């Protein structure tokens, strides 16, 4: 792989610690290795790869400027092989920040209960999983991976996958949009057993034992207070 980015000379190589109060946004660019994000209320937080035997060029490179922490996979322009299992990333982040993750062939895990201003995850050939997220806005887009979500509280959430499945437990929200091509959508619960679901599909179907009212592609559960848009081609919706 060849990874290039601007202002390469402003980056520092290797595992590091940083002060939580100095960071309001974290950006991660990663490839062919897993990313685990943990949230902590500690004053000093750590960022580490799984193997310390990497060369300086192979190590993660990072920059902290104006409250934004950027983490790159390796030195800009480096081309070469990496030891197997050496590049799994574990990062601790503060509560309430903006988190942006862009990765290829990487599984992303947001572990434990986490609170953000905004979360954006873009992944190619990787799964995205979270245990519990509360954020004003959540955007998750993966090409061939699953979105395996736990509890989700968000003013607005957009979850998209091409050939993967989407599983979430929506707790509190104004609107959730879910899109798949060939994947299924699983809603583990509905807030107050209530939702207004717009389900657009070609060959998919609704699978539920809940009572509902139907009007064209709109399904009303309970009083219909919570709005969910689901768009699939051949995927089913189950709840």
Language-model regions: role of each:
Residues 11-25, 34-38, 42, 57-139, ...:
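Right-handed parallel beta-helix
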Residues 16-19, 53-54, 77, 184-193:
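N-terminal short leaders/motifs
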Residues 26-28, 46:
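A short, Trp-centered hydrophobic/proline-enriched beta-strand micro-motif
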Residues 41-51:
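Short Gly/aromatic-enriched secondary-structure transition segments
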Residues 132, 138-141, 147-239:
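Short, surface-exposed interaction patches in beta-rich subdomains
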């Amino acid at each position: 792989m060849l990874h290039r980015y601007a202002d390469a000379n402003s980056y520092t190589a290797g595992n590091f610690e940083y002060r939580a109060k100095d960071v309001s946004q974290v950006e991660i660019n990663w490839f062919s290795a897993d990313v685990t994000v943990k949230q902590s209320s500690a004053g000093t937080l750590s960022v580490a790869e799984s193997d310390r035997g990497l060369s300086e060029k192979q190590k993660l490179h990072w920059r902290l400027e104006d409250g934004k922490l950027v983490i790159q996979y390796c030195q800009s322009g480096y081309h070469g092989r990496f030891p197997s299992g050496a590049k799994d990333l574990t990062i601790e982040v503060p509560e309430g920040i903006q988190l942006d993750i862009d990765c290829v062939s990487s599984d992303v895990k947001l572990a434990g209960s986490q609170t953000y201003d905004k979360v954006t995850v873009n992944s190619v050939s990787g799964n995205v999983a979270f245990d519990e997220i509360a954020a004003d806005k959540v955007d998750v887009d993966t090409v061939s991976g699953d979105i395996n979500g736990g509890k989700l509280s968000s003013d607005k959430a957009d979850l998209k996958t091409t050939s993967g499945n989407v599983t979430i437990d929506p707790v509190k929200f104004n609107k959730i949009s879910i899109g798949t091509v060939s994947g299924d959508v699983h809603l583990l619960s509905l807030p107050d057993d209530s939702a207004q679901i717009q389900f657009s599909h070609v060959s998919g179907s609704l699978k539920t034992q809940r009572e509902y009212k139907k009007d064209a592609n709109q399904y009303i559960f309970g009083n219909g207070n919570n709005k969910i848009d689901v768009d699939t081609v051949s995927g089913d919706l189950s709840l």
